[in-house]
Structures are given as structure tokens and as C-alpha cells.
A protein has these predicted regions:
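Carbohydrate-active catalytic/glycan-binding domains of CAZyme proteins
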Residues: 1-201
């Protein structure tokens, strides 16, 4: 496994990745790069036939019976947290525990593959309490994420909020909420440009 930080001292926003390198066992029992050093070359020549993969679709629609391989749930099969068949053409997720839970989150995610990316979702949600929320997250793990979500305020009106978790610290960069009135259908977007993230609605 490897990581590709954007700068020498920054985080690896693409997470852990699989890499291939030619290695040898050293006299002291450790794997070392065959050509020495600590940074492997970007490309290797191998004597294998080319195997082209189908490109991952840019847009996901849910007129399907099961999740495609590029969409993942977090530790729980989809049929325990949602459905692709209850409402044709939609992915339905059932409310469960919070985004910080290690046990039962209702999350469907797509891995970030590039340092620059954009994701947009169309979401329909009917929160009844302050504790009910659904939205779009840029998620590294349960201790590090950005979360744009819809919830309800004290008066029962729908609002958008942002939650940021950085280790053990939580904060709301909006210092409050954005009222969206009675709207239950909303488009949410995350735009990632290396170390910069912007949310839109």
C-alpha cells in the first residue's frame, strides 16, 4: 500500500492505494526496492499482455438491481441500509447511526481517484428532527471528513449545515445553518481542487 501526498507535508487525500514495485529481500530480512532508494520509478516494463478495463462511468443512475463495483458501502451490505428497488430509478437509504459511528452508517461512497474532482447528488429528504440528517460527504475516515447535510431546525424548517471533523475536533464553518424552507429536494455539490474544497447547493 502507498499514499500520494499533494505536497511533501500534506495529507494523502486519495487514501491508501495499491502500487507495484520490484523488490528484493535484503540481508537483514526487509523488502527493499530492487533499484535502491526509497522512491520507485513511475513506470515498469513487464512481459504481460495488455488488459484494458472498462472506464468507470462519470454519472451514476440507479435504474439497476445492485450497486456497481465502483460504489461502496461502509462495512454493511446495501440491503441492510437501503434499496435500489423500493423506488424505481432511485437509491433509497434508511436512517441509521451518525456519520461518526463505527457500527451502522447508511453510506454509499465512491473512491476519490484524482486530486481534482467534482461530485453532485440530487437528494430528496424529509427530516423530522434536529438529529435526522442526510447529505454529501468528502470522507477520509470517521475522524476526518467534511459533511454538507440537510436537517431540520428547532422550528421544523429544512436547513443545510456543514460539519467538519478534524481528528477529535468538530466545527461548523458556516457558524449556523442555511434555511431552505420547505424544500425537500436539493442538489448538493463538492468541488475538490487538491487541498481546496468548496461545497455548493
Amino acid at each position: 500500500l502507498c499514499g500520494r501526498p499533494i505536497t511533501q507535508r500534506s495529507r494523502c487525500i486519495l487514501g491508501r492505494e495499491t502500487c507495484i514495485a520490484q523488490v528484493v529481500w535484503s540481508d537483514d530480512g526487509w523488502l527493499r526496492l530492487k533499484d535502491g532508494g526509497v522512491v520507485p520509478p513511475k513506470e515498469y516494463s513487464v512481459n504481460l499482455p495488455e488488459h484494458k478495463l472498462e472506464p468507470i462511468p462519470v454519472k451514476d443512475t440507479f435504474n439497476i438491481k445492485e450497486l456497481p463495483p465502483h460504489l461502496n458501502t461502509l462495512r454493511i451490505p446495501l440491503d441492510e441500509i437501503g434499496s435500489l428497488t423500493e423506488r424505481e430509478g432511485y437509491l433509497r437509504l434508511y436512517g441509521n447511526e451518525s456519520i461518526t459511528s463505527w457500527n451502522k452508517q447508511s453510506m454509499v461512497a465512491r473512491r476519490l481517484q484524482h486530486h481534482n474532482a467534482e461530485a453532485t447528488i440530487k437528494m430528496e429528504f424529509y427530516p423530522e428532527t434536529l438529529q435526522q440528517m442526510a447529505g454529501l460527504t468528502v470522507f477520509y475516515d470517521t475522524y476526518n471528513f467534511f459533511y454538507l447535510y440537510m436537517s431540520s431546525d428547532e422550528m421544523g424548517h429544512n436547513v443545510l449545515r456543514i460539519c467538519v471533523r478534524d481528528g477529535l475536533k468538530f466545527y461548523n464553518p458556516l457558524n449556523g445553518a442555511i434555511s431552505i424552507g420547505e424544500h425537500s429536494e436539493v442538489y448538493l455539490r463538492a468541488k475538490i481542487d487538491k487541498l481546496k474544497l468548496n461545497f455548493y447547493y
